[in-house]
Amino acid sequence: MPTIQQLVRKGRTPKVVKTKAPALKANPQQRGVCTRVYTTTPKKPNSALRKVARVKLSNGQEVTAYIPGEGHNLQEHSMVLVRGGRVKDLPGVRYKIVRGALDTQAVKNRKQARSRYGAKMEKK
């Protein structure tokens, strides 16, 4: 424990909180344009072809974003909305594309967890 004199001299430095989604610049979402849409393979114990897109954000930064859900309509030059949220088994993927916003279509035939995939309520 420091003495009062040491605190007078130095003071206490506040802890620096490091953001997990730096490219969003403290915004909840950011608009961007897809520059490349492709698939990648996940880390060791898992095996799949995960759909990802390289997105140039409106603030000038370029990020890799995951496309959640089954099937998508994205291609080069598609306008997308990007939110934070990493994909654990894809190194370097720290952002996700919001389904049902801008050029991204919602997931078809989605019954549960619809709001996450931009799916509207099914009509009876």
From Swiss-Prot:
PROSITE patterns xrefs: RIBOSOMAL_S12
Keywords on record: Methylation, Ribonucleoprotein, Ribosomal protein, RNA-binding, rRNA-binding, tRNA-binding
Modification 3-methylthioaspartic acid, positions: D89
Family matches, as PANTHER family: 30S RIBOSOMAL PROTEIN S12 FAMILY MEMBER
Stored Pfam families: Ribosom_S12_S23 (PF00164)
Organism: Clavibacter michiganensis subsp. michiganensis (strain NCPPB 382)
Assembly and oligomerization: Part of the 30S ribosomal subunit. Contacts proteins S8 and S17. May interact with IF1 in the 30S initiation complex.
UniProt region (Disordered), positions on chain: 1-20
Function comment: With S4 and S5 plays an important role in translational accuracy. Interacts with and stabilizes bases of the 16S rRNA that are involved in tRNA selection in the A site and with the mRNA backbone. Located at the interface of the 30S and 50S subunits, it traverses the body of the 30S subunit contacting proteins on the other side and probably holding the rRNA structure together. The combined cluster of proteins S8, S12 and S17 appears to hold together the shoulder and platform of the 30S subunit.
Gene assigned in the entry: rpsL
GO BP annotation list: translation
SUPFAM superfamilies: Nucleic acid-binding proteins
Annotated GO CC locations: small ribosomal subunit
Family: Belongs to the universal ribosomal protein uS12 family.
Entry superkingdom: Bacteria
Composition bias type Basic residues, residue spans: 9-18
Protein name: Small ribosomal subunit protein uS12
UniProt-listed InterPro entries: NA-bd_OB-fold, Ribosomal_uS12, Ribosomal_uS12_bac
Keyword presence, RNA-binding: yes
One function term, GO molecular function aspect: structural constituent of ribosome
